[in-house]
Amino acid sequence: MQGRLSAWLVKHGLIHRSLGFDYQGIETLQIKPEDWHSIAVIFYVYGYNYLRSQCAYDVAPGGLLASVYHLTRIEDGVAQPEELCIKVFASRRNPRIPSVFWVWKSVDFQERESYDMLGISYDNHPRLKRILMPESWIGWPLRKDYIAPNFYEIQDAH
């Protein structure tokens, strides 16, 4: 089932894939990594001025990694703002997705966390480095094929 935004993207020749609607009726779209930044700018100009959240997950062991963006269109006098969910999939071998930091500044720490936990590199992010794990940490803890080390060095907090 194609939603209103999916139909609008088709009308304007913007490549995407409709993933239908979630349990709350929010339209979900899949965008290719190479198209994501330009389509993000279009959504911002169209009125999706608030990035509510960004997260990432490992689709399947040895499979793709996904970066998920929840956008909201906030307008004065509107009781129920429009929401949109975007999924961008990246290969496990070289997971690269354009950062949307320059579109929505609120994605700063969220893209860093996705990098830290899953190893997705967000191109043109101004401070892409680990945020939860030490810089010396090897591997990506939330990947399904991650093997946890047997030994954790406890560092002095002082």
From Swiss-Prot:
Biological function: NDH shuttles electrons from NAD(P)H:plastoquinone, via FMN and iron-sulfur (Fe-S) centers, to quinones in the photosynthetic chain and possibly in a chloroplast respiratory chain. The immediate electron acceptor for the enzyme in this species is believed to be plastoquinone. Couples the redox reaction to proton translocation, and thus conserves the redox energy in a proton gradient.
Chief location category: plastid
Pfam families per record: Complex1_30kDa (PF00329)
Record's subunit section: NDH is composed of at least 16 different subunits, 5 of which are encoded in the nucleus.
Catalytic reactions on record: a plastoquinone + NADH + (n+1) H(+)(in) = a plastoquinol + NAD(+) + n H(+)(out); a plastoquinone + NADPH + (n+1) H(+)(in) = a plastoquinol + NADP(+) + n H(+)(out)
Protein family according to the UniProt entry: Belongs to the complex I 30 kDa subunit family.
Record membrane topology: Peripheral membrane protein
The keyword Chloroplast is assigned to this record: yes
Name of the protein in question: NAD(P)H-quinone oxidoreductase subunit J, chloroplastic
Enzyme Commission code(s) on record: 7.1.1.-
GO molecular function terms attached to this record: NADH dehydrogenase (ubiquinone) activity; quinone binding
Compartments, as annotated in UniProt: Plastid, Chloroplast thylakoid membrane
InterPro entries: NADH_DH_suC, NADH_quin_OxRdtase_su_C/D-like, NADH_UbQ_OxRdtase_30kDa_su, NADH_UbQ_OxRdtase_CS
One GO CC term on file: chloroplast thylakoid membrane
Signal peptide residues on this chain, from the entry's feature table: none
Top-level enzyme category: translocase
Keywords from the UniProt entry: Chloroplast, Membrane, NAD, NADP, Plastid, Plastoquinone, Quinone, Thylakoid, Translocase, Transport
GO BP annotations, alphabetical order: photosynthesis, light reaction
